Amino acid sequence: MKGLFKSKPRTPADLVRQTRDLLLFSDRSTSLPDLRDSKRDEKMAELSRNIRDMKSILYGNSEAEPVAEACAQLTQEFFKEDTLRLLITCLPKLNLETRKDATQVVANLQRQQVNSRLIASDYLEANIDLMDVLIEGFENTDMALHYGAMFRECIRHQIVAKYVLESDHVKKFFDYIQLPNFDIAADAAATFKELLTRHKSTVAEFLTKNEDWFFADYNSKLLESSNYITRRQAIKLLGDILLDRSNSAVMTKYVSSRDNLRILMNLLRESSKSIQIEAFHVFKLFAANQNKPADIVNILVANRSKLLRLLADLKPDKEDERFEADKSQVLREIAALEPRDLA
């Protein structure tokens, strides 16, 4: 007879619904002063267990791999209503381990397909204001790494990345990258890189429309930063952006600017070899440009002897045939330049 009264096992959808109810409780509990602490603690402990159980379904555990059908059920229920919004809103009220679990759950759900569709993308398109909340999370020291990781997964969706790039939010990253907290600054830098490299056509469109202010800020705030790590990351990312074929029109304009050339020549003279090497990969684009403006040619000619000497001594720590071939080509290009009359 015992078997007749066994409770039915929870389905993934049940788990999400119960979690949603607990998140609603958590959201309201601060406005319920008469609520006993023991009751609140009990509910929060249950919420932590549920989020951990969702993580186990999505990632599997030491005993079992994730089951596709269970993942699909969980994903469908999660995005059916505002569970993601509730989870993001309530995240500061969760303990550290549960925040980590919740961050992993949100990250995984961005990649889950239901009937061959990424329904997270559809949900975020309809609830795009959630990106505003996640971005502002970078300003909260306790929450920045959790919100930052969620944000980075959300911009895997092109529609979300496009929204961020077209908003004023993108300008905030110039400051976030230089926050005094090293971990948060590094996380912001990783997110900025993802934003500017993942979706090629969206990035090319953004840079074409915004190249004047974007590169002015990039130069002054990042490449000329007093922080060595900021400069090193920025020159590496600049190379990744300009060397991408999708950005060829932007690159051509970038290497026609006297101000950009001046900054690159300063970076070539850095004491840090890693910055020098990364700066070379951008500088070679100026040298290779077959339609150099007269003022670019004249700057290169005026600094020719210094540049030839500096580049001759520049060697990566490991032998690199491609680097040496590029360097030889740049040396030839600079040596062959003739001064030009300014129009």
Swiss-Prot record:
Pfam families: Mo25. It comes from the Eukaryota. Coiled coil: none annotated. GO terms for cellular component: plastid. InterPro entries: ARM-like (IPR011989), ARM-type_fold (IPR016024), Mo25 (IPR013878). Belongs to the Mo25 family. This is Putative MO25-like protein At5g47540.
